[in-house]
């Protein structure tokens, strides 16, 4: 049997960059990368770190494919998040990272701030979400509260939106409970990239940050008919040039480990073009592992070395910094 440690990629990248400080791997299924981002932000908030590389990677294998097939939640065609006819997800693989930096050690022009975050554990079922969306409701509500903004100020929601009957119904119920009849524009990018599991929020955090930076709302592919439980209709076309100030991004894992992140423009730092991060890095790769974080200030030139390990298809480099704890 060929195997490797679950933190193999974490250790490999740390070794390649000569990192000997704080290194860890988080494995909480589909919320892994979101929890890595939160951990990095909280450690910086409490002055345990100056900077942190946070995110996740995951790769397809037969074990994963067979596992989801046994749950009967794989769609044999293209997945259809939030559509009435949805039957399951499409698996993907990839990686995405943010580099968070403290305000005091900020050196480069960044994109935005991580203004809020929350993790909840509803423990409703080993692989399913509660019909009322309790875990999703709590994680979104607490992330919004920790940011100090009101729900009506959110401009876009990057939903978890796997395309499975249970997840989308549960998340939809949670959205209705928080926003009522005034749900902000939302969409799932998983119809584009598939569900990348432990890497999902690493990649989708990048999408969320770029939504703010570029004024974009991404389309929810393959949607034709609203699900009767909520009647919610996602965005189905690319919106450009939209003033996006606050983006809520959801990642919900097996066992009810639900996490939400809130990315925001900061008025003061927008004027100075310095927000709450140092760098943003994204890649789509064929590699296996989960999130990691590190100590010390990381410069863009060093961050670029990460991508030489895996021949990335997509590479994005730019600056940023993290926020206050909840």
Residue positions per predicted region:
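Condensing-enzyme catalytic core mediating Claisen C-C bond formation in acyl metabolism
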Residues: 74, 78-147, 156
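Short, well-ordered amphipathic alpha-helical segments that serve as non-catalytic structural scaffolds
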Residues: 7-9, 132-148, 174, 178, ...
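Short beta-strand-to-turn element immediately C-terminal to the catalytic PLP-Schiff-base lysine
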Residues: 98-102, 176, 235, 262-266
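Short, intrinsically disordered C-terminal tails of secreted or membrane-associated proteins
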Residues: 316-325
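Acyl-CoA/ACP chain-elongation machinery
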Residues: 48-70, 75-86, 117-131, 159-168, ...
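Conserved small-residue
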Residues: 13, 33, 40, 68, ...
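Conserved catalytic cysteine-centered active-site region
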Residues: 1-39, 64-66, 70-91, 172-202
């Amino acid at each position: 049997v060929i195997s490797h440690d679950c933190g193999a990629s974490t250790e490999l990248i740390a070794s390649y960059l000569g990192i000997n400080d704080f290194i860890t791997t988080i494995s909480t299924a589909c919320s892994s990368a979101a929890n890595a981002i939160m951990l990095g932000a909280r450690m910086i908030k409490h002055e345990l770190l100056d900077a942190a590389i946070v995110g996740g990677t995951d790769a397809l294998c037969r074990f994963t494919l067979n596992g989801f097939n046994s749950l009967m939640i794989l769609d044999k065609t293209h997945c259809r998040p939030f559509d009435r006819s949805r039957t399951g997800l499409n698996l993907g693989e990839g990686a995405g990272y943010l580099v968070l930096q403290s305000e005091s050690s900020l050196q480069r022009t960044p994109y935005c701030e991580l203004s809020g975050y929350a993790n909840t554990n509803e423990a409703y079922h080993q692989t399913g979400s509660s019909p009322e969306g309790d875990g999703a409701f709590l994680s979104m509500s607490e992330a919004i509260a920790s940011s100090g903004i009101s729900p009506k100020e959110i401009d876009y929601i990057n939903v978890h939106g796997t395309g499975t009957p249970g997840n989308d119904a549960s998340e939809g119920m949670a959205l209705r409970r928080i926003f009522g009849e005034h749900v902000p524009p939302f969409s799932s990018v998983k119809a584009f990239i598939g569900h990348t599991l432990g890497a999902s929020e690493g990649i989708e955090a990048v999408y969320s940050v770029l939504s703010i930076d570029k004024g974009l709302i991404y389309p929810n592919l393959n949607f034709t008919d609203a699900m009767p439980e909520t009647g919610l209709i996602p965005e189905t076309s690319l919106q450009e040039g939209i003033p996006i100030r606050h983006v809520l991004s959801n990642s919900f894992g097996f066992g009810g480990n639900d996490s939400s992140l809130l990315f925001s423009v900061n008025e003061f730092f927008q004027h100075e073009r310095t927000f709450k991060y140092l760098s943003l890095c994204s890649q789509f790769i064929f590699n296996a592992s989960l999130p990691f974080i590190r100590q010390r200030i990381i410069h863009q030139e060093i961050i670029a070395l990460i991508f030489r390990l895996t021949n990335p298809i997509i590479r994005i480099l730019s600056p940023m910094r993290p926020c206050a704890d909840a």
